Structures are given as structure tokens and as C-alpha cells.
Amino acid sequence: MPAPHVPDFIDGKIGYYALAGETSISEGTIEAVRASAQVALTGADTIASGQAQHIFSLCRPPGHHASRDQYGGYCFINNAAIAAQYMRENGAAKVAILDVDFHHGNGTQAIFYDRADVLFLSLHGDPKHAFPHFLGYADEVGHGKGDGYNINYPMAPQTPYDKWVEALDHAIASIRSYAPDSLIVSFGADTFEHDPISFFKLKSDDYFDMGARINALGLPTLTVMEGGYAVKDIGINTVNFLIGLER
């Protein structure tokens, strides 16, 4: 955090530690956050121990907007980042995190921005038009040892799958060149055409192809659930992605 002084009153603390005001804390929040992280860790352990090639961790609340010192965007702690660090400490020399949620994974980026052992790639709505607004631009490429290991693909409103998948193919090529030991996918179904708070135009059948392309990398893959707000469709879109990941 750039400011050295933490306010004493509660509204000030919320403004200091929260990147946005929509992420409320209530009875049961801490238990849910802890359980969500444990789901990601269980998935990471299953991958790291070689028990499975693909694991889906249905994490709620999500995590990719949370950094070391800020929460927000419905995220409190970063499940994907915790899983990546666990993999690093349990046999993986390099880990790649591919974030395909509609919103930029600003928290994941911040956590690994100065590291070369975790490659972070994010496909998302252009932050000029979408949350989190202040991060997710193409010129954010990492810092220090992490220079070149952060890759952002901001995309315009109304982007259809045939344009979106061009960015995915570029990201997949970068992952293949990086040659990680394991892959984490931060999956959000809010890229769907009828998602109420997003502006991409992916259709339900597109998620089959998305999963299949990622599967072609042949990497042990942990999928961690992030966003998705078209309530009637989030289930089928997630299932379609997971089916594609097994193809």
C-alpha cells in the first residue's frame, strides 16, 4: 500500500484495505473464505502428488482480485495464488496461471509481479471499460525478476469468441514456451454473452472449445472457479468447459 497510515475508524479501514465497496463482511465470511482456500489447496495437493491430471476446485468466494494487502471484487484471499505457491513448494519448479475470467486478475498479478517462477496470463475486458479499471493493461509486463512473466490481453466490448480465442491461442503458445510443470486456470463464466455485468459475447458451446484448447497443452491442470453472474447459465457453461478440458 502506498499510504503508511491505517485509519482508526471502520469506514476508513474498509477504504484502505478494500479496492471496492461491494465486498461485504458478515457472519460466516471468515469460515467461507477459509473453506474456499482449503478447496483450492486440496486441488493443488491432488495435482502435486500426481493423483490426477485435471482437478476442478469449486471455490466460493472467488479470489483473483485479492492481493497480499487488499480484498475486493467479491474476493478476500487469492485461492489461485495460494494453490500456485503450494505447487511451487511441492515439486513444481515453474507454474503458469491462466486467468480466463472476464475481469482482470489484478490480485494474482500483484502477488507474482516480480517473480519468474510463476507466469501469469490474463484475458479480460479492457479496464478502460471494466473492473478493476486501474490494472490489466498490456504494458504491465512484470518487474525485476518478473519482467516478461506477466502478460495481459485486454479486449474491447462485444468481443466474440472468434476474436477472444486469438488471444487464448497466443497465451497458450506463451505457456508452451514457458514449459511449466503445472497449470492453474482461473475460470470465470462471466465471459458469457448474457452475463449481466460483463460485455463479451461467448456462447455456451464456445466453452467446449476453450477447454479443449487448454487441454492440448498436456499439463497437470487445476481449475479454480472465479466469477460468473448469469445464474441460470453458469452451471452449463462451467460443465462445458470441464468437458472440453477432458477432450
State what each model feature region is:
Residues M1-R247:
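HDAC/HDAC-like amidohydrolase catalytic core signature
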